[in-house]
Amino acid sequence: GNIKAPEPDSGFVCSYLDVAYNGNIFMWDSAFMMMFARFGTRFFPFQRTLDNFYAKQHPDGFICREIKADGADCFERYDPTSTGPNILPWSEIVYYKQFGDIDRLHKIFPALCAYYKWLKLNHTWRNGTYWTSGWGTGMDNMPRVEPKYNPIYSHGHMIWLDVCLQ
């Protein structure tokens, strides 16, 4: 099945729903899967999938958007493709609105705040708008940079409206 137990010494804190793509856990996919998997919470505590991202959060607030099964980040923090848009709070608030789990919200709020601060410090332009890359946005099949830039890796010196709105 697609429910994976954490590997020993991975730093993951619980079993998780796997996208069955390459053995890695993805922030974007996991956040959106949780919005649907919440309906099966009597079968498995799917929302805890996101706890593995919080457990792998760096001291400065960075969370890698893709993490290997052994717990290693797939990208360095300053790589333009290293992290995804700030969609974890969206998934968490949807879960909270359905289940009213205030204890979970209290537990994860510091991690969400630290990640927000990291994004604000490292993925914004001088005017406060956000940037990312094709892979970083999670919508890597929607090239939007000019042809002279790499659609996967480059921010194209643009303001990424979808990231600003998230």
Where are the regions that the model predicts?
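The substrate-binding groove and active-site-proximal loops of carbohydrate-active enzymes
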Residues: 20, 27-28, 32, 71-78, ...
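Well-ordered alpha-helical scaffold segments within catalytic/enzyme domains
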Residues: 31-44, 87-104, 165-166
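Conserved helix-loop functional segments at active or binding sites
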Residues: 5, 59, 94
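Extended, well-ordered alpha-helical scaffold segments
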Residues: 42-55, 102-122
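Solvent-exposed, acidic/flexible segments
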Residues: 26, 43, 78-81, 85, ...
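The feature captures the catalytic groove of carbohydrate-active enzymes
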Residues: 14, 19, 65-87, 120-166
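Low-complexity, Ser/Thr/Pro/Gly-enriched N-terminal "stalk/linker" regions
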Residues: 1-25, 44-48, 52
